[in-house]
Design a protein with these regions (language model features):
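N-terminal capping segment at the start of a domain
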Residues: 23-66, 78, 82, 293, ...
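A non-catalytic alpha/beta surface segment that caps or lines the substrate-entry region
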Residues: 56-106
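Metal-dependent peptidase/peptidase-like ectodomains
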Residues: 111, 170-276, 288
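Acidic/His- and Gly-rich active-site-bordering loop/insert found
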Residues: 49, 75, 92-127
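Bacterial N-terminal signal peptides
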Residues: 7-16
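Second-shell loop/turn segments in exported
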Residues: 28-36, 52-62, 90-93, 101, ...
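His/Asp/Glu-rich mid-to-C-terminal helical/loop segments that flank catalytic regions of hydrolases
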Residues: 292-329
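Alpha-helical metal-binding/catalytic segments enriched in His/Glu/Asp
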Residues: 104, 116-117, 121-177, 321
Length: 329
């Protein structure tokens, strides 16, 4: 497993370098980044994060450290800048475990920020049983990494957006949203410094928080004949749902969309405002959205494995999130 893990990581880093070296001299549009999102790469990302070497990615474990290193190495390979005091942002979980968020900045031309996040932790290995967490939430991290790479590719081609994109892989979600609250504390206390501008990122500088949490499953369908669906939870007034509707007109996307959690006001409120990583941002008035394909019967089970995900549909969801961001930046 070690050899396969290292080979797959090497291949992903090599593909990132190759993408950065593409020829110029053509009209730049967001569509130029579509080829970065491939089913093969997404599958490799999920397989790496669900490998036995990552051991289920429970906070404070060697498997979590390996997952952090994997994410950090890819952030670095994409050219995402690290804060002066480091890419790994340490904190303690509710159970006292050492945990770390992993961050990377893609500089924009202006002074505002958009946070794009996905939690990488899961429940680990219990009583000798590995809980891989493919959908929850290796799929979200794979989406995060792919979106980061897509925007980096556009920047290499000469396209820069006004807000700086702050990509964050969050730890400790399964323990009281620890990583999300730690990220907010660092922002509120001025401890997260923009490595390019050289000044702290403050809450008032943030335009939006986008959270990606479980986007690989197809079992919790909106309509039984449409496995290709996506749920976006947001406040109606600030979520920019129109941006997702426009993104969905692309033939490469064309998903079955919903803006609530299966028609339930109560479940929509719980998942949007209480139990997901956008909570501390919402609590402080930052417009936030959550992308998900919903909870399935595999959640928190050993059967949540990489082969159970639909990577063609995951790719389309990644494109939807990417084009949503393009519209709101």
């Amino acid at each position: 497993m070690t050899r396969k893990f290292l080979y797959t990581l090497f291949l992903l880093l090599a593909l990132s370098a190759a993408a950065a070296a593409q020829p110029r001299g053509f009209r730049i549009s967001a569509r130029n980044a579509e080829r970065i999102a491939s089913e093969t790469d997404l599958r490799m990302q999920v397989e790496l994060l669900t490998d036995s070497l990552c051991a289920g990615r429970a906070p404070g474990t060697a498997g979590s450290v390996r997952a952090q290193a994997l994410i950090a190495s890819q952030f670095a390979s994409f050219g995402l800048a690290a804060p002066p005091d480091g890419r790994f942002r340490g904190f303690r979980t509710l159970s006292g475990k050492n945990a770390h968020n992993v961050v990377g900045f893609l500089p924009g031309s202006g002074d505002r920020y958009v946070v794009v996040a996905a939690h990488f932790d899961h429940i680990g290995t219990l009583a000798g049983t590995l809980y891989p967490g493919a959908d929850s939430n290796a799929s979200g991290v794979a989406a995060l990494l792919t979106v980061a790479r897509m925007f980096r590719h556009l920047k290499d081609l000469g396209k820069t957006y006004s807000p700086t994109l702050l990509f964050v892989a969050l730890d400790g979600k399964e323990q009281g949203l620890g990583g999300a609250f730690h990220l907010w504390e660092e922002l509120a206390e001025g401890r997260l410094v923009d490595p390019v501008k050289g000044k702290p990122v403050r809450p008032e500088d943030i335009d939006r928080m986008v959270n990606i949490d479980q986007v690989g499953g197809t079992e919790a369908r909106l309509r039984k004949y449409r496995p290709d669906y996506l749920i976006m939870l947001s406040d109606a007034g600030t979520g920019r749902r129109d941006a997702l509707l426009v993104a969905n007109t692309s033939p490469e996307v064309s998903l079955d969309l919903a803006f609530d959690y299966y028609g339930s006001k109560d479940f929509t409120r719980v998942f949007f405002r209480t139990v997901s990583d956008q909570k501390p941002f919402l609590d402080h008035g930052i417009p936030s959205v959550m992308f998900t394909s919903g909870i399935t019967f595999r959640n928190n089970k050993a059967s949540d494995t990489a082969p159970t995900l639909d990577y063609a549909i995951l790719r389309r969801r990644v494109l939807a999130i990417f084009y949503y961001l393009v519209r709101v930046l």
